[in-house]
């Protein structure tokens, strides 16, 4: 009986995973776009939509002490983050403002988002959560057999693009990669309407649309990690400038139309990061060997510690890369109620079964926060913690009025 139950579960999952995905030609894909122009999305728009569509709301600052915490600023909370991150509302709001501007093709779409802050402030966890969001997105349409899963509309000749854009109601950006251009000419006689198009989902493990670049020392750094390599076994068969020798398996190739993450980005030699300049400002990356530049559409996320950032920006020779970076500072949680939720989340996911005495978590949270804030000339540390938590501080029967912004500016915690 148990075997039948397991088999039923397996078959149910398999039927879901084998949901029919589109396979057709460019002509059929054009019909789909005509019915729904939102099918065509750039990377920032796709990522912003999948997070925003999970639900969001504007916090009522008159409730629950939010007016004290946020000083009357309008704050939006996003359902996608609310069960994972606590006390990071301001940081997440800045992240989503960046994403929205980039989705609308603002200057942010040509910049690198850098999460910078102390160890344990949630930089890596936030980046991982954003990457997981992309795996929830609808499968993307792309050229069948293309190593960088590029947008099928790249097949449209530039001379015809204004006419197609008017009919379809979308903007066509980008050019064919060298491999697909070679296939179009040699396999399809230039008849781009017959080029096959398919759908596939985003997957970090499958290296489809999500790439991660770990920090490397000077001896092991190789630009091929970013832009791919030439297949040496094919150099005996084809000339060096033949697209068929290309193996486009670098991070910018894998992360095209998705996300490229740089882990501890400034632990790398600065020369290794020069590809970022063309990837952001020109939306192109070099191809291996002697081929043309390759169009790149992707969200570049990176993170580092504060000391590494200070060392990087202190070097005047790094100005070019510095100008392409949007810095988002992550900080430790300074709100008592949110710190308690963090501890409760950790305990809930652990295997600890020991009884915890009443108020233990609250006292531990108070200790953590008071160890993070600095002494102020306006109040003691305990009072400061209460103000950061949005509480009214009553002293000698009167409410003690201390501006939270004055406390923040005093030491810039």
Where are these regions (language model features)?
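N-terminal accessory segments that target, anchor, or regulate ATP-driven/P-loop NTPase machines
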Residues: 1-58, 117-120
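Conserved ASCE/P-loop NTPase catalytic core
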Residues: 37-413
